[in-house]
């Protein structure tokens, strides 16, 4: 790989440096990225590792440092960071496809009434787009289910009351890739952080938070539990108590079956990817299990106190600091899973960052 990059930045200070502002714009172009280049089937191989294509990452990073309050005994220091990144494919080898797209499939285009190809990688597009079948609820009666569109995903299995309703977007009586809708991207494009430090005489309080916006997560962990009888001993209570049991019971999820939803072709929870969803094991490709990954994380709340010199001089000590803190405290989030910091698109039940506590005494002789 070869990379060309340039940065333009400005570093400003105001009010005797009680307010500082750093702004940096970057633009990085990477040539000859390493990809799996598809091969013709006549070669006997599906792909080969190859250096081809160009990717541009550009964005802005902003850092603001301020001391809003500063008196003889009290001060408040505030640090804010913000970063925005846009990554797009600039160039791919000519393969006869529009935008030289590699991979992907066709979806319905309401603007034209026809179809358009999406997914994979293509010139002028971001990485990591995700599409899924649009879950509308459940069939409440056998009469409703009898009118369901044909579902090749379910290999011809007939629908019944309690099965999932997926939108037939193009109204052709068939559920296929053309009916998948765009859900979002797997990586956030906006991230930031907040650091507050408050000091009063020898007492210091530090509060650290960070956030991310712009990504979606497919809760494959919940989808697998709901869609596989082999996991019924680990079933999520919220999901189990909210599964369809009878007509118009207000449930959120399709019926839970002893038979595996996946193996027995119910396909109420786990759907095939059709080349534009995610082919990763555990992906649901079902909008029911997608949600925004936006979060605000509380990383640290710590407290420290420097004992006054008048207290410690008699002990022939130069400094004594007592401290305590809590770390990885929790999140404000929209995602219903445990851990929103997932940038691969699929949550396999990743264990979240462990919450930590510490306390101690630091002594200088």
Enumerate the predicted regions with their spans:
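Active-site-adjacent bridging/hinge elements
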Residues: 34-38, 59, 166-174, 266-280, ...
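Intrinsic disorder/low-complexity segments
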Residues: 2, 102-103, 188-190, 211, ...
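Glycine-rich, aromatic-lined ligand/substrate-binding cores of catalytic
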Residues: 183-220
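Short, hydrophobic/aromatic alpha-helical segments in well-folded domains
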Residues: 9, 176-179, 191-194
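Amphipathic, heptad-repeat alpha-helical segments used for oligomerization and assembly
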Residues: 173-178, 182-186, 281-293
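Conserved small-residue
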Residues: 50, 67-184, 226-227, 234-264
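Extracellular/periplasmic, surface-exposed regions of secreted and cell-surface proteins
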Residues: 1-121, 281-365
């Amino acid at each position: 790989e070869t990379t060309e990059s340039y940065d333009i930045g400005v570093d400003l200070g105001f009010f005797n440096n009680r307010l500082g502002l750093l702004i940096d714009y970057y633009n990085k172009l990477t040539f000859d990225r390493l990809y799996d280049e598809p091969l013709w089937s006549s070669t006997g191989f599906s792909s080969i590792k190859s250096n081809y294509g160009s990717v541009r990452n550009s964005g802005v990073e902003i850092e603001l440092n301020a001391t809003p309050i500063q008196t003889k005994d009290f001060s408040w220091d505030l640090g804010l960071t913000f970063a925005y990144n846009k990554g797009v494919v600039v160039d791919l080898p000519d393969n006869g496809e529009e935008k030289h797209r590699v991979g992907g499939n066709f979806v319905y285009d309401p603007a034209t009434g026809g179809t358009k190809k999406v997914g994979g990688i293509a010139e002028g597009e971001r990485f990591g787009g995700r599409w899924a079948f649009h879950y509308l609820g459940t069939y409440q009666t056998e009469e409703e289910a009898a009118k369901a569109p044909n579902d090749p995903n379910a290999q011809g299995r007939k629908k019944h009351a309690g099965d999932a309703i997926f939108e037939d977007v193009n109204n052709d009586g068939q559920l296929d890739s053309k009916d998948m809708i765009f859900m979002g991207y797997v990586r956030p494009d906006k991230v930031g952080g907040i650091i507050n430090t408050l000091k009063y005489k020898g007492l210091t309080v530090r509060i650290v938070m960070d956030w991310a916006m712009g990504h979606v997560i497919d809760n494959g962990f919940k989808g697998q539990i709901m869609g596989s009888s082999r996991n019924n001993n680990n079933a999520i209570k919220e999901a189990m108590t909210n599964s369809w049991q009878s007509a118009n019971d207000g449930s959120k999820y399709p019926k839970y079956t002893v038979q595996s939803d996946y193996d027995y072709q119910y396909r109420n929870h786990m759907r095939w990817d059709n080349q534009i969803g995610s082919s990763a094991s555990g992906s649901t490709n079902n909008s029911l299990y997608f949600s925004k990954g936006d979060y605000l994380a509380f990383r640290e709340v710590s407290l420290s106190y420097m004992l006054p010199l008048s207290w410690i001089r008699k002990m022939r000590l130069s400094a004594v600091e007592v401290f305590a803190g809590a770390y990885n405290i929790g999140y404000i989030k929209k995602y219903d899973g445990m851990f929103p910091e997932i940038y691969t698109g699929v949550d396999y039940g990743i264990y979240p960052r462990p919450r930590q506590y510490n306390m101690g005494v630091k002594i200088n002789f």
